Amino acid sequence: MAVAYYCLSLFLLSTWVALLLQPLQGAWGAPLEPMYPGDYATHEQRAQYETQLRRYINTLTRPRYGKRDEDTAGLPGRQLPPCTSLLVGLMPCAAARS
């Protein structure tokens, strides 16, 4: 029993440490917004900030391709006829016709 308690506590402790040591960006994959250098920054600092800001905006707004590009979301490719039942919303159209 003591060994099981020791293993469980070691597992929980290591999980807690792993969660605390995660990088700020890595968990969700979104980049961090660059820090504004201030009103009295040099031209080089402002140029670097603008470059980082442009990269940040391009990363967040880039088009995504693949499965997310489909508009159907798994629905059939044909148009279904409209339901003329009085019970629309209470039962599916197929059940109302039979």
Swiss-Prot record:
CDD domains: PAH. One of its GO terms (cellular component) is extracellular space. SMART domains: PAH (SM00309). InterPro entries: Pancreatic_hormone-like, Pancreatic_hormone-like_CS. Residues 1-29 form the signal peptide. One of its GO terms (molecular function) is neuropeptide Y receptor binding. GO terms for biological process: feeding behavior; neuropeptide signaling pathway. Pfam families: Hormone_3 (PF00159). PROSITE patterns: PANCREATIC_HORMONE_1, PANCREATIC_HORMONE_2. The modification Tyrosine amide is found at Y65. It is found in: Secreted. No icosapeptide-like peptide is cleaved from the C-terminal. Belongs to the NPY family. This is Pancreatic polypeptide prohormone.
